[in-house]
Amino acid sequence: MASTLRLGTSALRSSSIAAKPVVQSAAFNGLRCYSTGKAKSLKETFAEKLPAELEKVKKLRKEHGSKVIGEVTLDQAYGGARGVKCLVWEGSVLDSEEGIRFRGRTIPECQELLPKAPGGQEPLPEGLFWLLLTGEIPTEQQVRDLSAEWAARSDLPKFIEELIDRCPSTLHPMSQFSLAVTALEHESAFAKAYAKGINKKDYWNYTFEDSMDLIAKLPTIAAKIYRNVFKDGKVAPIQKDKDYSYNLANQLGYGDNNDFVELMRLYLTIHSDHEGGNVSAHTTHLVGSALSSPMLSLAAGLNGLAGPLHGLANQEVLNWLTKMKAAIGNDLSDEAIKNYLWSTLNAGQVVPGYGHAVLRKTDPRYVSQREFALRKLPDDPMFKLVSQVYKIAPGVLTEHGKTKNPYPNVDAHSGVLLQYYGLTEANYYTVLFGVSRALGVLPQLIIDRALGAPIERPKSYSTELSPSLLVLSCK
């Protein structure tokens, strides 16, 4: 839906979908903002674009459905399906040279074009959510209305609060996060409607409602886990006149630091989506294809994100930097860092935060965080160390010769920024990643149901049958 389509209101009337009314008034960061009635809601915008998108996909499949889009090698089958072209993901496309594009927009373009909070420099993630779902850059009023709608939907059911409170503090924050999101299935409009029987054309409507409710509740869930495990258990209420990132920062206990709030806006934006093949995105899509609710689908994605090969990399970067400082002491010379890099590699270990399955250049998400740090914390010792490693590591990794991408990815920087502002509990960081990732995977889930995407069911083969497959491919 990346193209901009302007359809008449008849398209919306012809649908059986009844859009929720736009919030008529809301205070936003201290400014009273009133809907004029002219700003289309997110649901209205998506509903208007849907008929044309359905026709586009129908035409594409009719004209090119039998065309080959790629080949699969035996190595790819055994190697995690790397590079296999078999998924449709509308929100973002990852180019190996230039990095991620959200609906065709680079990160710098999103930083420039998406609405910001008054006095802020970073984009509001509400705007990115709108962009990922519709392909359009929203107006400031539309983003304010979306902020207000999420705030209005944010109240947690009492049993969810009690469920989190009963978790032992020793239970990993991601396990608690997944547990709470799974339990929200009790509130799923999609699950209840499906049980009663609904038209397939209406699937997206209930998926949309669940996704909006779920996203709205994530900051309070995430903050409650953080405050229970690491602080005094007290969580500030959602402020209805504030944006999504402010409320998350404030509920965590850092709302009085404007720079941390800005960091959350940047963090939630750049961690939201990274194509559809990564574990959390693909898992959410896969589970959703079985018509599981957004709650169950996202919870499955969060469980994938909790894996050390996916969502724990920024924590591992911090651990590695800390060990390096302890090992080389005050001698933070280029030569000492170079030697430590080599000792890491020679021990058969990877340098965390460097390399990527797809990227072959410095991750633009790393660059955006580096630019933030240069503005806000240029003299921080850990940032200086990260910068020093950035200068040295690519050369060492290239000389080592076992990586296709010797450049830093997003994880090489994010943990250092969070540490600087006092959020030092590294085993909590993946929860923040999960809040952000919801903003990327749930738009696609809505699109999947709107386009009638089928259940995912690739074909598998055993190792014993592989030789016969190779013989057939050579004929």
Swiss-Prot record:
One of its GO terms (biological process) is citrate metabolic process. It is found in: Mitochondrion matrix. Gene3D superfamilies: Citrate Synthase, domain 1, Cytochrome P450-Terp, domain 2. GO terms for molecular function: citrate (Si)-synthase activity. It catalyses: oxaloacetate + acetyl-CoA + H2O = citrate + CoA + H(+). InterPro entries: Citrate_synth-like_lrg_a-sub (IPR016142), Citrate_synth-like_sm_a-sub (IPR016143), Citrate_synthase (IPR002020), Citrate_synthase_AS (IPR019810), Citrate_synthase_euk (IPR010109), Citrate_synthase_sf (IPR036969). Keywords: Mitochondrion, Transferase, Transit peptide, Tricarboxylic acid cycle. One of its GO terms (cellular component) is mitochondrial matrix. The active site is at H310, H356, D411. It comes from the Eukaryota. CDD domains: ScCit1-2_like. It is an enzyme of class 2 (transferase). Its EC number is 2.3.3.16. Pathway: Carbohydrate metabolism; tricarboxylic acid cycle; isocitrate from oxaloacetate: step 1/2. Belongs to the citrate synthase family. Citrate synthase is found in nearly all cells capable of oxidative metabolism. This is Citrate synthase, mitochondrial. It comes from Aspergillus niger.
